[in-house]
């Protein structure tokens, strides 16, 4: 299976461990993230129009020094799945999605008619996030989550694609120990908006694994680690909480 994300740092987070999780689950999954930090759907569309070679080509969760256009990446191989998402601070602002979302998906459908198209539903910011875009939601996590649910639902319906429910599962895990941040638990964000390098990236990759690859994360032995946190030790009980929440949500919602 070959998965391409037309994305930004939030799809970078989602794909960091996806290939490794798939390998551990005995699945042949290749991933590519087209990365521009903070890239909106409007900018993606403008980059398509201009055939701009501005995207870092991140294969199987790894950075590279290769930069490509969306057209070059699409034409490179036969993708099984192609995803796109809105930039996080606009994720709950419905007016920012279209017409760009519709134009992107129409272009990709014409270019790659055999690929299955999906939309990646991203997550709300941490309750104390200092991101400037949080003000659009009155600095309220629940308000941001509800807004992005509405916006992603409408956008996905407008282009007739299913949703990868990362934002839903993140919000679910935030209600379970040890991830209840407002009670002193672990935040699933590393800086108030990007997802935690270990637990958060694992969570979102697990959602993609179950949703797109048909895997069962409960049976998967992969344990995340990163050179960015060389001394970090993953708590197996915390990981088990994530796995259970992901599987419960995805097995019920993603069949």
How does the language model describe each region?
Residues 2-4, 10-98:
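Conserved SGNH/GDSL esterase-like catalytic core that processes O-acyl groups on lipids
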Residues 185-255:
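Conserved catalytic region of serine esterases and O-acyltransferases that act on ester linkages
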Residues 11, 15, 101, 145-149, ...:
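A structural signal for well-ordered alpha-helical scaffolds and beta->alpha junctions
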């Amino acid at each position: 299976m070959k998965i391409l994300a037309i994305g930004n740092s939030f799809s970078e987070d989602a794909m960091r461990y996806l290939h490794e999780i798939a390998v551990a689950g005995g699945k042949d999954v290749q991933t590519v993230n087209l990365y521009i930090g903070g890239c909106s759907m409007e900018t993606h569309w403008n980059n398509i129009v201009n055939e701009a070679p501005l995207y870092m080509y991140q294969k199987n969760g790894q950075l590279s020094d290769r930069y490509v256009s969306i057209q070059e990446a699409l034409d490179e191989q036969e993708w099984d799945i192609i995803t796109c998402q809105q930039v996080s601070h606009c994720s709950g602002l419905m007016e920012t999605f279209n017409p760009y979302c519709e134009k992107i998906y129409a272009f990709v459908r014409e270019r790659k008619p055999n690929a299955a198209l999906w939309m990646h539903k991203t997550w709300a910011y941490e309750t104390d996030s200092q991101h400037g875009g949080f003000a659009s939601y009155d600095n309220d996590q629940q308000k941001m989550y509800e807004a992005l649910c509405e916006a992603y639902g409408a956008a996905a319906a407008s282009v007739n694609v299913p949703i990868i429910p990362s934002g839903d599962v993140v919000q679910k895990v935030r209600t379970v120990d040890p991830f209840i941040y407002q009670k002193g638990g672990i935040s699933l964000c590393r800086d108030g908006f990007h997802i935690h390098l270990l637990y958060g990236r694992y969570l979102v990759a697990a959602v993609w694994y179950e949703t797109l690859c048909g895997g069962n994360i409960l049976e998967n032995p992969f344990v995340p680690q990163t050179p960015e946190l060389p001394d970090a030790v993953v708590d197996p009980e915390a990981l088990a909480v994530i796995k259970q929440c992901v599987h419960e949500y995805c097995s019920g919602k993603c069949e």
